[in-house]
């Protein structure tokens, strides 16, 4: 892309997802902001901004994926540095918002950590948050600053449309994901099915029943996050057992922790389509996994925010 040409737009990256950050700046046509994110000898974060940002719209790109605590602390310190350097606005771009699954008190005496993270970002000095497919949309209400939540479904829909799959059914792996599945199904002009599951303890899922017709069909399971891959692989195996012709799976955020890769390798999933909101280690880039880039979407959102244009067109 040609140079954007506005010196008042500054984009900086921290350590969690540099590949995506550089894709975004290349897409916009601006150089990456000059800064260093290092550690003191005792492990404390040291940040230095190496250019003037006075009066600029600053965008900080950082997924708060594992190690989540390290990446959150980097982001908070960077926000403080930018604020003290007299930036006009501090726009925090968080492709993957860590701690989003801790959005409510599931049991007595539990914290609501997603709200705590929101408080920390605001207190540090963030003036806007730009993110993608929050695990719980109500997290937007945890902030008293603007939150732009972009959607990954159009990217996934375009990918599957180009594959030209026949007789598709879109599957939600649980009742909570029905709205997401419906959005993909509407774009693919396909019916939906639902996996009715019971989760006896965290990261352990048991498939109980399938609601909807899947026999002889090509199933596409969609979720927002795949962590240990227990839910998605059990769902895929159950779909095949109930007569699905083949099974694809997709998600926005590939956490892929613990036994996830082995489970995916050994599952009935033909292809897992993910996005690059989280940078995957080399050993996780197996043949079954296809990665799509969110850089064009996020670059467009950044430019629109900077130019005070509407971002709502990017929400659907």
From Swiss-Prot:
Binding site for D-ribose 5-phosphate: 199, 223, 227-231
Active site residues according to the UniProt entry: 197
Keyword Transferase: yes
This enzyme's EC code(s): 2.7.6.1
Gene3D superfamilies for the chain: 3.40.50.2020
Co-factor requirement: Mg(2+)
UniProt binding sites for ATP: 42-44, 101-102
Record carries keyword Endoplasmic reticulum: no
SUPFAM superfamilies linked to this entry: PRTase-like (SSF53271)
Enzymatic reactions: D-ribose 5-phosphate + ATP = 5-phospho-alpha-D-ribose 1-diphosphate + AMP + H(+)
Residues that bind Mg(2+) 2: 174
GO cellular component, as recorded: cytoplasm; ribose phosphate diphosphokinase complex
Biological processes, Gene Ontology terms: 5-phosphoribose 1-diphosphate biosynthetic process; purine nucleotide biosynthetic process; ribonucleoside monophosphate biosynthetic process
Subunit structure, as described in the record: Homohexamer.
Function recorded in the entry: Involved in the biosynthesis of the central metabolite phospho-alpha-D-ribosyl-1-pyrophosphate (PRPP) via the transfer of pyrophosphoryl group from ATP to 1-hydroxyl of ribose-5-phosphate (Rib-5-P).
Protein name per its UniProtKB record: Ribose-phosphate pyrophosphokinase
Source organism of this protein record: Halalkalibacterium halodurans (strain ATCC BAA-125 / DSM 18197 / FERM 7344 / JCM 9153 / C-125)
Protein encoded by which gene: prs
């Amino acid at each position: 892309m040609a140079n954007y040409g506005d010196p008042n737009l500054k984009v900086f990256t921290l350590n969690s997802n540099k590949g995506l950050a550089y894709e975004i700046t290349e897409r916009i046509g601006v150089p990456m902001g000059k800064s260093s994110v290092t550690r003191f000898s005792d492990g404390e974060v040291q940040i230095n901004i190496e250019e003037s940002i006075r009066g600029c719209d600053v965008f900080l790109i950082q997924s708060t994926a594992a190690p989540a605590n390290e990446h959150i602390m980097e982001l908070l310190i960077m926000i403080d540095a930018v604020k003290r350097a007299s930036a006009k606005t501090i726009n925090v771009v968080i492709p993957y918002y860590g701690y989003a699954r801790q959005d409510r008190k599931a049991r007595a005496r539990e914290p609501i950590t997603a709200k705590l993270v929101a408080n920390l970002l605001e207190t540090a000095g963030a003036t806007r948050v730009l993110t993608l497919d929050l695990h719980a949309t109500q997290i937007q209400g945890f902030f008293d600053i603007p939150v732009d939540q972009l959607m990954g479904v159009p990217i996934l829909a375009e990918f599957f449309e180009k594959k030209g799959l026949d007789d598709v059914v879109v599957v939600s792996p649980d009742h909570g994901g029905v709205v997401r599945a419906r959005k993909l199904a509407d774009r693919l002009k396909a019916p939906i099915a639902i996996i009715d599951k019971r989760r006896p303890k965290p990261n352990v899922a048991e498939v109980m029943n399938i609601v909807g017709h899947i026999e002889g069909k090509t199933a596409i399971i969609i979720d927002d996050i795949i962590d240990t891959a227990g839910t998605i692989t059990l769902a895929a195996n159950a779909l095949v057992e109930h007569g699905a012709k083949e099974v694809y799976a997709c998600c926005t955020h590939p956490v892929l922790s613990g036994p996830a890769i082995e489970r995916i390798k050994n599952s009935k999933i033909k292809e897992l389509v993910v996005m690059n909101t989280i940078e995957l280690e080399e050993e996780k880039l197996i043949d079954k996994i296809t990665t799509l880039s969110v850089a064009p979407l996020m670059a467009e959102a950044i430019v629109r925010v900077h130019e005070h244009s509407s971002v709502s067109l990017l929400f659907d």
